[in-house]
Structure formats: C-alpha cells, structure tokens
C-alpha cells in the first residue's frame, strides 16, 4: 500500500523541503535501519523545551514544581499518542510485517515515539521556529483548556472535590495489608465511599502512594 505523505503534511500544516526527513521519522525499527529512533531522541528534547517555555510564559505565578507537573502531563506518552491519533498518524507509519500484524499502528508507545520523531524531522527541515509553531498548533486546545491546571491536584484531592460536587460522602481509605521485607514493603489500601457500590484498590511502596492510587482508581470508576 502506497502511503500518501503529502496528506500527512497537510494535516500537520507543514510542507517539508526534504521529504526524506519525514519518511525516516515515520519508519519503525522493524522496517529498516534508517528508522526514527535517533529522531525520537531529538524530538523528545525539542518538545520538552517548547512546552516548558510556553508554560513558563503562560503561568508566571506557578512554582517550579507546578510547571514540572504540567509539562510532565502534557508530554507523557498517552498524551502524545492521543494527538497522534487525532492526526491519523498510524495510517502513515512504515512498519515491519510483524508489527503490522500485531497492530503496531495503534500502539500507544509507537504512536508517541513517531510523533516525537516527526517534531525532530520538522526541526531538522525547517529549524526551531517551524518546530515550535507546529508543536503549539498541535497542543493549542490542551494549552488553552481551562481545566489544564487540574492535573496539579493529586488524586485524593480530585476525588474529594468530585464527591463534594456530586453530594456524596467523603472516601474512606483502609490499610488492608502490608507485605514484604522491612526495606521493601508493599502497602495495600482499599477505598470505599458510603452509599457507593464501587470499591477501589491501590498498592504502593508506602501508604500515601497506595492511597493516591486507590483514589485515582475510584475516580476513574465514578467518571466512567
């Protein structure tokens, strides 16, 4: 099947002077030695810088920790794959037969890596200004989202606010088990809410982490 790279360029709103950059950025390691692995390395750093710079300018009152959490939220693999799916990136990937058969064009990790590689390809082809422009275009709806700062709140806080807004009782966290050696303990926590049938569980290296994971699991259940 012939892949129409010009169509992808239109979706990216960027025309490559050297289409070889784009083709390499779309080539998985299973499809050849001239693949996107090195591009991915470069694209990861470019994306991180552009998003960090944008957040720094948009949120002058945020602390370093808050800016770091926002950046981590925006550049995580799941977010990259989500953006990749929005532009139909999976349809343009060059994959080996094994990856094709196993549905690699839908895999979150492959989509995320390929998107980072494309950002590197744009940088190599058109410079930092072009790369920044495309990154901010792809991220515009997320950067402008009034709920973006919700990711700064931990899971227990988000769950409590959700329950209060929905007129539910507050959650109860119960430590049900601690296992393992003293220097490598595993804590098990159960989260329940009076009047709610769902039960959520969290496991972590300390009680706080286990409670946070249980709260996250409960919130995901309640929000469907």
Swiss-Prot record:
UniProt key word tRNA processing: yes
Major subcellular location class: cytoplasm
Active site: residue positions: 44, 116
Annotated catalysed reactions: Endonucleolytic cleavage to 5'-phosphomonoester
Top enzyme category: hydrolase
PROSITE patterns xrefs: DS_RBD, RNASE_3_1, RNASE_3_2
Entry cofactors: Mg(2+)
Pfam families: dsrm, Ribonucleas_3_3
Any one Gene Ontology BP term: tRNA processing
Domain RNase III: start-end pairs: 5-127
SMART domains membership: DSRM, RIBOc
Residues given in the record as Mg(2+) binding sites: 40, 113, 116
Keywords linked to the UniProt accession: Cytoplasm, Endonuclease, Hydrolase, Magnesium, Metal-binding, mRNA processing, Nuclease, RNA-binding, rRNA processing, rRNA-binding, tRNA processing
Keyword Zinc: no
Compartment(s) where it occurs, according to its Swiss-Prot or TrEMBL record: Cytoplasm
Gene Ontology molecular functions: double-stranded RNA binding; metal ion binding; ribonuclease III activity; rRNA binding
UniProt-listed Enzyme Commission number(s): 3.1.26.3
DRBM domain: residues covered: 154-224
GO cellular-component term (any): cytoplasm
Function: Digests double-stranded RNA. Involved in the processing of primary rRNA transcript to yield the immediate precursors to the large and small rRNAs (23S and 16S). Processes some mRNAs, and tRNAs when they are encoded in the rRNA operon. Processes pre-crRNA and tracrRNA of type II CRISPR loci if present in the organism.
Subunit structure: Homodimer.
Family: Belongs to the ribonuclease III family.
HAMAP family associated with the record: RNase_III (MF_00104)
Entry protein name: Ribonuclease 3
Biological source species: Legionella pneumophila (strain Lens)
Protein encoded by which gene: rnc
